[in-house]
């Protein structure tokens, strides 16, 4: 057992060492790209795309792509990525989860794998937990990506189908997990391919607050239905129930991500209050949404 645990840590050290080496290569190109004019730097996107068209893989152009994005971020939003942020970006490109503390530059880190994967032209989705974060990141990181010649879209609930097609048709699309999920469900209900909003399909996604989205948020199913006639009564019942809850004991509020979730104690209270055995049974989805 001890040897297995030791092996896990050894593998992690090897992985970090590999990421460190690649990050150093990226930093070593700083002088090369800082010497370019804005026009020459932006044109590197075309240079990198041509390499992909000539048969190169994304991993082959990673170092140059990250170095280009690093210089562009410095010029456009005055943030210089350090080694730890580059390492995080490489890990995200590899499909791994990168855990970073508050203040370590998670938003800046996301630019690098997003830019690299957008070079394929197949589309990239950046998924966040709420509209505020999606709009903020689209606005701030969008300055860097648009400077480099990429198109950036923001997917919101109030958009028309045509506007959603335009947003999803961009090189990079910022969206919430719920809105992307509903777009996917609606696309599977259309009778004509022309009505689909995910015009590029799903290629590469970068998920912010991945633990919240893939674990916490996944407890609430995304269901499209016609709704029930007793929805008003359910609102009143849910309202009375919520007023009986105690903060921190029955529910927790995450100020940073602007989300609220029932605790285990709160879930038990709900099941007793509404006389059900499992709050997160699909048949109680409407109740969960009302709460």
Language model feature labels by segment:
Residues 1-291:
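Conserved P-loop NTPase motor core
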């Amino acid at each position: 057992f001890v040897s297995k645990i030791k092996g896990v840590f050894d593998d992690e050290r090897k992985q970090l060492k590999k990421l460190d080496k690649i990050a150093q290569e990226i930093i070593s190109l700083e002088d090369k790209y800082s010497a370019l004019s804005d026009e020459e730097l932006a044109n590197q996107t075309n240079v990198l795309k041509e390499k992909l068209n000539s048969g190169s893989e994304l991993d082959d152009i990673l170092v140059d792509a990250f170095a280009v994005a690093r210089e562009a971020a410095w010029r456009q939003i005055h943030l210089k990525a350090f080694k730890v942020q580059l390492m995080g970006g490489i890990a995200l490109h590899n499909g791994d989860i990168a855990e970073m503390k508050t203040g370590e530059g998670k938003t800046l880190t996301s630019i690098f794998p997003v830019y690299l994967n957008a070079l394929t032209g197949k589309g990239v989705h950046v998924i966040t937990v709420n509209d505020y974060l999606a709009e903020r990141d689209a606005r701030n990181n969008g300055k860097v990506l648009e400077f480099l010649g990429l198109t950036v879209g923001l997917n919101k609930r109030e958009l028309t189908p045509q506007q959603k097609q335009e947003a999803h048709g961009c090189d990079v699309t910022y969206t919430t997990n719920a809105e992307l999920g509903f777009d996917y469900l609606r696309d599977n209900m259309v009778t004509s391919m022309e009505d689909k909003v995910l015009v590029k399909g799903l290629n590469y996604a970068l998920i912010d607050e991945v633990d919240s989205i893939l674990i916490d948020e996944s407890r609430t199913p995304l269901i499209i239905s016609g709704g029930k006639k007793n929805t008003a009564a359910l609102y009143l019942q849910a309202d009375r129930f919520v007023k009986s809850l105690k903060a921190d004991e029955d529910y927790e509020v995450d100020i940073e991500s602007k989300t609220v979730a029932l605790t285990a104690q709160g879930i038990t209270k709900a099941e007793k209050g509404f006389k059900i055995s499992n709050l997160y049974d699909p048949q109680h989805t409407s109740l969960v949404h009302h709460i």
